[in-house]
Amino acid sequence: MTGFARFAELCERISQTSGSLEKTDILASFLSDLESDDLRIVAGFVMGVVIPGTELGVGPSLLYESISRATGLSSDAVNELLRATGDPGLVAYRAVERRKPLTLAAFSGSEGLEVQDVYQRFLSIAKASGRGSQEIRVKNLQYMFSEASPLEAKYIARLAMEDMRIGVGEGLVRDAIAKAFGVSKEDVERAYNLTNDLGLVAEYAKLGRLNELGISINRPIKMMLAQIGESIEASLAEGATAVEWKFDGARVQIHKDKGNVRIFSRRLEDVTSSLPEIREIVRGHVRARTAILDGEAVATGEDGRPLPFQEILRRFRRKYGVARTAKTIPLKLHLFDIIYMDGASLLDEPLEERRRVLVSVADPEIIAEQVVTSDVHRVEEIYREALAAGHEGVMLKNPSSTYTPGKRGKNWLKIKPLLESLDLVVIGARWGEGKRANLLGSYRLACIDTDTGELKDVGWVATGITDEMLAELTELFRELIVKENGMEVEVHPEIVFEVGYEEIQRSPNYSSGYALRFPRLIAVRDDKSPSEADTLERIGEIYRLQRGRSKK
């Protein structure tokens, strides 16, 4: 069993190391010494992932209440620490340093926290629901802070916020697993894309069984992604393509196991209970005994046209009153791929074969229409039809391409009328002036560096926010403020904005090296987590594409 103090010391050492290679070496050495049970947990913890695909549901106010109870400090004293540090981890560190003697014996008899203890406490927090769930979360956090040293408390708090702030992302953990257990980075990445669980990948790599990890029913896999197509004509340069509408909806991955149907969102979170009609559609219209299906759920109005994306998100977020909401925001299912059927993986089959299988097991009314053609004019016609129907554009897919989980490449291209929007994490905000003095009027945006997990800013957005939205957003972000500096505030990176813009420019003013010209808010993407924000690499690709440049 691994003491949590050892894990906290690892995080502290990594945070004080600047180079990615050095960080990889430190982490690889640590992972190689762990037993399998602890290894699986630590590989996730170091990225701020406690349970893959599951949010803990701990907000800043709940965290600070737990710290206050565990240390005996008043709420005002905890808030003063927050104003001074702007970091939940440092708040916990300093609060535990000042912990009142009475609280030290509150949970006597402990021999110190272990990684397994902390994991089980967070598991209880994640499972808490319904009446009394907030108190369950507070008490579990209170227990951990009562038992923790200042350094342990620092990283318990950051785990609770799912933000470790040590510069470790998926890429670095992948490389560390490969180095620790003598396997290739490519094999680690393949296994991760098939399981969405680097902890599980690390465990199997240690056992020398990495090749045993594959696609499995009821375990979501990363979805194949599309990149931006330069134009219809350029996209058809290599021959015939499979053309489908790009629906204005929400991506879903559906796992059917006989009569049991589970639905996963783009974030690979289980949303089955929120989408009962999709579950029933699959039960009634898919004949395969077991299957993993890829598709889009679209909210439709009385005229058959898609409703705004925010309406779809209302369905995905809904936990209570689902039946009532389903009547006002009905969903249609459009399936476009099948990647597993009756015990066999279809990942390595070409798209045209996967399509044949899909058509053989699903009824036509739930399958997205597809036309295979090399005729530019026919594709343009389908593109115009999609836009006229209220959808986003078209997808152009290579008929001979395999399904590559988690990959964005030229085998799937999306053609839309405007520059591709970006999904960016909000990391700060600025108070307004005059009549908007009590409202947060503009928001600082960041992309993610996948190698380090760090957020790199790309500018601010204020356009596209109505007065009504200002009030709602202010309430949303007020809870997430971690530090104030004059008119500006730093917020916990939890909310993702979909942002449009005129172009991407090079800029030395932001840590990303890029800036958005004339950004505007399109939507608050509640269906996406910060880890799913657009990457620094992708912003660079869009910059080169809009300039007609090729990567050097």
Swiss-Prot record:
The function of this protein is: DNA ligase that seals nicks in double-stranded DNA during DNA replication, DNA recombination and DNA repair.
Where are the active-site residues found? K246
Q: Name one GO molecular function term.
A: metal ion binding
What are the BP-aspect GO terms?
cell division; DNA biosynthetic process; DNA recombination; DNA repair; lagging strand elongation
Q: Which HAMAP family match?
A: DNA_ligase (MF_00407)
E.C. number: 6.5.1.1
Q: Which family does it belong to?
A: Belongs to the ATP-dependent DNA ligase family.
Q: Give all cystine bridges in this chain.
A: none
The source's superkingdom equals: Archaea
Q: Any idea what this protein is called?
A: DNA ligase
Report the SUPFAM superfamilies cross-referenced here.
ATP-dependent DNA ligase DNA-binding domain, DNA ligase/mRNA capping enzyme, catalytic domain, Nucleic acid-binding proteins
Q: Which UniProt keywords apply?
A: ATP-binding, Cell cycle, Cell division, DNA damage, DNA recombination, DNA repair, DNA replication, Ligase, Magnesium, Metal-binding, Nucleotide-binding
User: Which Gene3D superfamilies does the record cross-reference, listed alphabetically?
Assistant: DNA ligase, ATP-dependent, N-terminal domain, DNA ligase/mRNA capping enzyme, Nucleic acid-binding proteins
Give the catalysed reaction(s), semicolon-separated: ATP + (deoxyribonucleotide)n-3'-hydroxyl + 5'-phospho-(deoxyribonucleotide)m = (deoxyribonucleotide)n+m + AMP + diphosphate
Cofactor dependence: Mg(2+)
